[in-house]
Amino acid sequence: MPKTFHEIPRVRPATPVLDRAATPEQLRRLGEAELEELANELRQELLYSVGRTGGHFGAGLGVIELTIALHYVYDTPDDRLVWDVGHQAYPHKILTGRRERMGTLRQKDGLAAFPRRVESEYDTFGVGHSSTSISAALGMAVAARLKGEQRKSIAVIGDGALTAGMAFEALNHAPEVGANMLVVLNDNDMSISRNVGGLSNYLAKILSSRTYSSMREGSKKILSRLPGAWEIARRTEEYAKGMLVPGTLFEELGWNYIGPIDGHDLPTLIATLRNMRDLDGPQFLHVVTKKGKGFAPAEADPITWHAISKLEPVGAPPAPKKPTGPKYSNVFGQWLCDMAAADPRLTGITPAMKEGSDLVAFSERYPDRYFDVAIAEQHAVTLAAGMACEGLKPVVAIYSTFLQRAYDQLIHDVAVQNLDVLFAIDRAGLVGEDGPTHAGSFDLSYLRCIPGMLVMTPSDENEMRRMLTTGYHFEGPAAVRYPRGSGPNASIEPALEPLEIGKAVVRRRGSKVALLVFGVQLPEALQVGDALDATVVDMRFVKPLDEALLRELAGSHELLVTVEENSIMGGAGSAVAEFLAAEGVLRPILHLGLPDYYVEHAKPSEMLAECGLDAAGIEVAVRKRLAALGKA
């Protein structure tokens, strides 16, 4: 059984077995008797590595044994192993030649937080969002068959990710094409079944064996000539399996379901995987694991220990903290509770982001008006549309990167019908160490083109609160997009006061240059304004724009500069350029925003500097354009 550890080691532990398993090829040379100790050492190494860098923690601890078993039984990387989401892939990275680079995890030019094809041949599919693994592995299985290759395809998906419709679309399709593939359900929340034990493990070994499979097919041929007898035999088998396993749904879809088995029992895992590796057709293995397994604090509180921050070295003085305001998500959570108290029609909807979007207090105070739909963004948006049709006032709290998954529902089910749905869009812009899969780089571009949509970008906490109220009372769909992290500590007015729609605010009057800021780069723009004696405008609204102010600024300044933490292509700056072009106004415009490439993981400050969105970068870009115009 796995050892249990109680502290994160500050000094690298001795790992004599892991030292001999730097790659899956080396791992497969170990004797099975050594694998239990390998699991203990790998768990310690993971604790040590993530303690140095920070990162996702609990999920990886829960799949130590499963990761070892998969690489031990299958011929990776020739056999294609696809991890869903990737939170659990740190042990996989350690075992696939990247152990010595784990100290660079989630750092600029270091290892990514998730599997990336460009990082290793063992990362067969890039992930970050959930529920994609089965579709990807199915595509690989089909490709192998068409190319005449014998390689296997394996998808590892969690019980949470299995709630998404995309996963079931793939589960439904795979039997139709007769794919030779394996889906491993990593059930770490006991959400499907708690029926795990010796009898279930024993049954899994029997049902996954080639002998059983051959006998079953032989019996089917014989008994098929006697329809009554075959039906009795089939029902008896299903009844016996149904008493022990919850696999009826997967069997009905056409999968050979095995499990549930203990995901921390290495001998059972290896024996079952070996049996299933040799079976044809779509195979489904249900393993039950414990999130945070082997680390006592994470086992006791898996939510808190889902991810951790970097630990400071022993004896080091605590890093000084700059005074900051509340997190933007906290501002939203407080506003939601305040507005719910004022309006009983309000409902709050989230796709499995209660903690991240700060709906915890709302869920406790208003449980009947709180809806966590799990990882089902499409359903979340159309659920809100249905509520709005009946006079409720739904607020959808969702990360920018995940709203992309429900774009059709946003247009077809909400916007076309002009329904009153407010989208509180968290994690807009660059998010730091999680990298491009989690960045909110495109929401202004894909929202502002939707007819009737109100789109707002706050520059501080108080402005955000007022924008949420503005959007809530707006007749039609509205969106407030705000970044990860804390604001500049603006004084927050407790009242639920809206803003005048489409009205920008001039924060500094200058000459020659006008900086038009959409969002949280306002402090940096004010620094540049002081350095260049430039006008600085908090634009607030991306749609509708403050057209009267834009006409005035275009007529009184020699250069307009738009600043946004969104893709330059199609973003707020594009809206300004389109408006001026339609007005027939010819004025030089400089667009500053996210470039036409994916900005890789790093600290947020490093990413902003790379994109020229810090104060220094904005000033350099403006001076360069003025020089090019002969206006320096």
From Swiss-Prot:
SMART domains: Transket_pyr (SM00861). It comes from the Bacteria. GO terms for molecular function: 1-deoxy-D-xylulose-5-phosphate synthase activity; magnesium ion binding; thiamine pyrophosphate binding. Mg(2+) binds at residues 159, 188. This is 1-deoxy-D-xylulose-5-phosphate synthase. Pathway: Metabolic intermediate biosynthesis; 1-deoxy-D-xylulose 5-phosphate biosynthesis; 1-deoxy-D-xylulose 5-phosphate from D-glyceraldehyde 3-phosphate and pyruvate: step 1/1. Keywords: Isoprene biosynthesis, Magnesium, Metal-binding, Thiamine biosynthesis, Thiamine pyrophosphate, Transferase. Its cofactor is Mg(2+); thiamine diphosphate. Gene3D superfamilies: 3.40.50.920, 3.40.50.970. It catalyses: D-glyceraldehyde 3-phosphate + pyruvate + H(+) = 1-deoxy-D-xylulose 5-phosphate + CO2. Belongs to the transketolase family. DXPS subfamily. Thiamine diphosphate binds at residues 87, 128-130, 160-161, 188, 295, 377. Catalyzes the acyloin condensation reaction between C atoms 2 and 3 of pyruvate and glyceraldehyde 3-phosphate to yield 1-deoxy-D-xylulose-5-phosphate (DXP). InterPro entries: Dxylulose-5-P_synthase, THDP-binding, Transketo_C/PFOR_II, Transketolase-like_Pyr-bd, Transketolase_BS, Transketolase_C. GO terms for biological process: 1-deoxy-D-xylulose 5-phosphate biosynthetic process; isopentenyl diphosphate biosynthetic process, methylerythritol 4-phosphate pathway; terpenoid biosynthetic process; thiamine biosynthetic process. Its EC number is 2.2.1.7. Binds 1 Mg(2+) ion per subunit. Binds 1 thiamine pyrophosphate per subunit. Homodimer. GO terms for cellular component: cytosol.
